[in-house]
Regions:
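Extracytoplasmic beta-strand/coil segments of soluble accessory domains associated
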Residues: 1-24
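Short acidic/polar hinge/loop motifs at secondary-structure boundaries
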Residues: 23-49
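Outer-membrane beta-barrel pore domains and translocons
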Residues: 50, 68, 80-86, 98, ...
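Hydrophobic, lipid-facing positions within transmembrane beta-strands of outer-membrane proteins
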Residues: 4, 63, 89-93, 147-153, ...
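Flexible loop and strand-edge segments within Gram-negative outer membrane beta-barrel domains
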Residues: 119, 142-148, 164-214, 224-253
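Outer-envelope beta-barrel architecture signal
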Residues: 16, 73-77, 89, 100-108, ...
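Periplasmic-side early beta-strands and strand-to-turn transitions of outer-membrane beta-barrels
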Residues: 82, 101-186
Length: 253
């Protein structure tokens, strides 16, 4: 759930473009990113430094990262569960079912991530109410939960005379993130949080040797609805020990 900055050729931020199967990742909304894409759907990761292939259709100065999902032509089921430090849990499920007579394909995918992020902050300042002065100590982060859900369903046809594939896709992404600190660790929050939700509908098509040998037609279209909310209603000031006192303004103001 932490912010990240990936650098290629000394450039980062908007100088790098991210894609999933050649489609801009941003098409699924801001809540869908590298940190919450289900690992089990990834077949390989293509990294391009500097020059970006024409089929990606991007103009990134630093380069591009294209995540290629499982392209198997067989039925499969894949489920995984991972656990890590600071009460981190990750669950992924994806499958592919192909109807043998018609070639109609169904591809459901679900990913869930959760972490408390309650690691220890060392040498932070807290208010001692008895002495009415600040003291230094080590305290765990108490308001830094991260939770994300990604669900996608694809259906379409593969390996037809008229198409290598034609898929219609519907997806939903939800990210809930507590806000623990401000620009520095001296500013502590205990109630404010952010929510991001995205709904996406899309269609993608590809046909090699379209009308002529060596000519490939690739097309995609999508529409995304997105809602971002910052909740900041607590009129209090928090300290690293979890205690708080009343204030005349909200936390993020």
């Amino acid at each position: 759930g932490s912010d990240y900055n990936l650098t290629l050729n000394g450039m980062g931020g908007n100088s790098i473009r991210y894609y999933v199967d050649g489609i801009p990742m941003a098409a699924k909304g801001e809540s869908f990113s590298l940190e919450n894409i289900p690992a089990s759907i990834v077949d390989r990761v293509e990294v391009y430094k500097g020059v970006v292939p024409a089929y990606l259709g991007g103009d990134a100065l630093g380069g591009a990262i294209n995540i290629v999902t499982n392209e198997s032509k067989k039925n499969y089921y894949d489920i995984s569960y991972r656990v890590g430090s600071f009460n981190t849990h990750q669950v992924d499920f994806n499958a592919q079912i192909i109807e043998p007579k018609t070639g109609l394909t169904f591809k459901p995918s679900v990913g869930y991530n959760f972490s408390k992020n309650n690691y220890t902050m060392k040498g932070v300042r807290v208010l001692n109410p008895e002495k009415n002065e600040f003291e230094t100590g080590d305290f765990k982060r108490f308001h830094d939960d991260y939770r994300s859900v990604f669900a996608q369903f694809e259906t379409g046809f593969t390996n037809k005379l008229w198409a290598d594939f034609l898929y219609v896709t519907a997806s939903f992404t939800n990210v809930d993130k507590d806000i623990q600190t401000g620009a520095t660790q001296d500013v502590v929050y205990g109630a404010a949080h952010r929510k991001n939700r995205s709904w996406n509908l899309g269609i993608r098509y590809r046909k090699k040797n379209f009308l002529a040998e060596g000519l490939t037609l690739s097309a995609n279209a999508s529409h995304t609805w997105q809602k971002s909310t910052t909740v900041d209603t607590a009129m209090v000031i928090y300290f690293w020990n979890g205690h708080h006192r009343p204030a005349d303004y909200a936390e993020l103001n």
